[in-house]
Amino acid sequence: MVDVFTVLIVVIQNVYNMKLKIKVKVLAKGCMPVLNDVGDWIDLKSAVDMEIPAPQSGTLKKTTINGERIGHRDVELPVYYIPLGVAMQLPQGFEAIIASRSSGSKKLGLFIPIGQGVVDNIYKGNDDQWHYICSPMRETTIEAGDKICQFRIQLSQKATMWQKIKWLLSSGIELVEVDDLGNDNRGMNITGIK
């Protein structure tokens, strides 16, 4: 008779030796993300060259507050969607967080106006290209292939107990390049605000 404890050990060892696979369809040459041993996040690259102008301030407005004349200008920060040249299928029960690189604000003058971007698990179609949604602090130039942001995966709030255990026991993640993700396109920003 097979010892249940032995079977359990074998199952745990097999799960532990498993890596969570992220399928990646490369849409622009040179944009395949690369796992490296330095740092916990995965760099993403711009798929295009872009000239981004500095934000423009409006006309000077003067207001009197408590008898004091105060001048101010409204500044509009435009939002840019920089294509990252990849579409990905995350493992079930996971989502991705996109954030600026630590040097991004200083070197590129870009920031994410909402702090970070979230890529849901359902955004996994062949044409569901990831984007870096950002605003400029100054005029800047981006070239295709520049590392402009980074991402990591984490459990989603809908992750099952099995997906949580798999994450806990996995030996990391693996990026697998594919020609076809085999999923319907979800589109970007399609859910609206109402």
What is the meaning of each model-derived region?
Residues 5, 10-194:
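DUTPase catalytic domain/fold
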